[in-house]
Amino acid sequence: QRYISYAVFCLKKKMEKQTTFLAGLMIMLSIVFGAFGAHALKTILEPTQLDTFDVGVRYQGFLAMGVLVLSLNTHRFAFQIKGILWAMLIGMFLFSFSIYGLVLGPHFLGANAFRFLGPVTPIGGAISIISWCVFLFRLLKYGQA
């Protein structure tokens, strides 16, 4: 019994490290991409394209901050949060990085580059929204530990 509890504890700690690291990495990248957009892309992109790129940067930062806060507090929840955190990260990645590809692809790789990413953006957004809804539902249902 004690060994099983210890194994579960170790798995939770490893998961916390992974999601915390990935959230921190995504926050750092949102800062880098924001600076890249504000300086290097200003002369390359049209204002509407720059605004679209900025939406990806903004949501990447917001969603990554949320994942960081939750991953640092997994011990406070009376329910499993691992799947929710991974869904949040996947949704954020699909949403933001598909926007980056759609905006930057035509400028660097040709007019039709990354057009296939068009449907990926709303799928990533939906995954992000649903994962936050599941988190809130479970929080209301099970509360905190």
Task: List each language-model region with its residue ranges.
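Positively charged, low-complexity/disordered segments
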Residues: 1-15
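Polytopic transmembrane helical bundles with strong interfacial aromatic enrichment
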Residues: 16-145
